[in-house]
């Protein structure tokens, strides 16, 4: 029996309402708007208050369901990509399943950091092609404000909270053209968080900030920024070139590239090395900062909402993250 094809039915997103500007950060750490924008391209980021990761994921899921015109009962599988789950167990996916009442679906989490959503797209596609599922909800969601050291200007300026989602469905036409995934554990220590508490919420941040230094050890994100920058540029180019080659397409055939929104300077370097206009990349890092697994689906949902993609257009999703991991996918909009 011939395997089924897969396409994206709908997308959704949710951003918490609290926006923290660079100017706001300058009141609590030694930084300023120009310093942050010059190095990262970030102007502001969203932060949760009183919301868990599952709450953000639930709202993005409901948005995608509404736009797709389907009920939660029609979902066969829910995949949540996150490094900031509500708990060690149960999975955030199961909590979201309960919240949206998608009781016919099975659900699980994956942890691939900023590459997680594209990993989820790959997994969902395989379940559909193999006939195990017909409709799959893939969510990328993070509440990174739990893991940010608000005294460290090198990291707290970068991250934000948010959630994006996509519903994949079986199709007669091929929408998910190619996926390329990779990882290299030799770089595991370049970007890490050894936090023993995954349920720190915004109300507890003040307590953490007033704690003794030894109490804070290992609770926050640690990153070798220079090495991550070099790694990111290399694997993003590698990922883009790989999915183009496997799809027998060229850069001129691509309408949009949706990159992981980690640092505007990374995207600029990739564009320069590929010899393409930066306008081919969809960029929203100035509004939201780095939302890890949520960054690509949030951007995809925005592109969808704005009507920037028409039937037959080609879009590349490409990202990188802790692990080290990287992922790219070439999608035809149908």
Curated annotation (Swiss-Prot):
InterPro entries: ACP_syn_III_C, ACP_syn_III_N, FabH, Thiolase-like. The active site is at 114, 260, 290. It is found in: Cytoplasm. GO terms for cellular component: cytoplasm. Its EC number is 2.3.1.180. One of its GO terms (molecular function) is beta-ketoacyl-acyl-carrier-protein synthase III activity. Keywords: Acyltransferase, Cytoplasm, Fatty acid biosynthesis, Fatty acid metabolism, Lipid biosynthesis, Lipid metabolism, Multifunctional enzyme, Transferase. The keyword Signal does not apply. The keyword Transferase applies. It is an enzyme of class 2 (transferase). It catalyses: malonyl-[ACP] + acetyl-CoA + H(+) = 3-oxobutanoyl-[ACP] + CO2 + CoA. Pathway: Lipid metabolism; fatty acid biosynthesis. Its main location: cytoplasm. One of its GO terms (biological process) is fatty acid biosynthetic process. SUPFAM superfamilies: Thiolase-like. CDD domains: KAS_III. It comes from the Bacteria. HAMAP family: FabH (MF_01815). The last Arg residue of the ACP-binding site is essential for the weak association between ACP/AcpP and FabH. PANTHER family: 3-OXOACYL-[ACYL-CARRIER-PROTEIN] SYNTHASE, BETA-KETOACYL-[ACYL-CARRIER-PROTEIN] SYNTHASE III, CHLOROPLASTIC. Homodimer. Catalyzes the condensation reaction of fatty acid synthesis by the addition to an acyl acceptor of two carbons from malonyl-ACP. Catalyzes the first condensation reaction which initiates fatty acid synthesis and may therefore play a role in governing the total rate of fatty acid production. Possesses both acetoacetyl-ACP synthase and acetyl transacylase activities. Its substrate specificity determines the biosynthesis of branched-chain and/or straight-chain of fatty acids. Belongs to the thiolase-like superfamily. FabH family. This is Beta-ketoacyl-[acyl-carrier-protein] synthase III. It comes from Clostridium tetani (strain Massachusetts / E88).
